[in-house]
């Protein structure tokens, strides 16, 4: 058995990737595995939804992250509409907005979110931006980075470091 000590939790990513690659079992003590951290899962969900509009799990994870005034009742009504009409959550949201079935405040947030997703999809097609640049744009334009920067505490500083580490990992 061996132990590896790191100063900051984001530094575990390279070890984790190497251990996974060679099939070596490992445990993280005093922290969460890199790809299981909320901010990393959020980034991956953004990228998944941008590339696949039918990804309801990704949609649900990020539709109100950061906060966009989209409450649980709105999410529930989107789910119900989706089941009744046999549509994915993104398509249901668009249709509900068109038919004025969303409360005004939530409608603004949901429309803004859908417009961003559409804009990023278009940037991939038209500008051919790579996945690293895309994630940088998503973090800035979605307000995700600003959300973490505005809450000045150690946990959010670590989350920002984790996002930087994810971008580095994507460049490798």
Task: Locate each region found by the language model.
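C-terminal helical "lid" of AAA+/P-loop NTPase domains
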Residues: 76-82
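Surface-exposed charge patches
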Residues: 17, 21, 80, 137
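Accessory C-terminal helicase-associated subdomains
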Residues: 24, 66, 96-172
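Phosphate/pyrophosphate-binding and catalytic-coupling "lid/hinge/switch" segments at subdomain interfaces
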Residues: 33, 67-68
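Conserved motor-region signature of P-loop NTPase helicases/translocases
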Residues: 1-60, 150-158, 167-168
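Conserved phosphoryl-transfer catalytic core
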Residues: 92-94
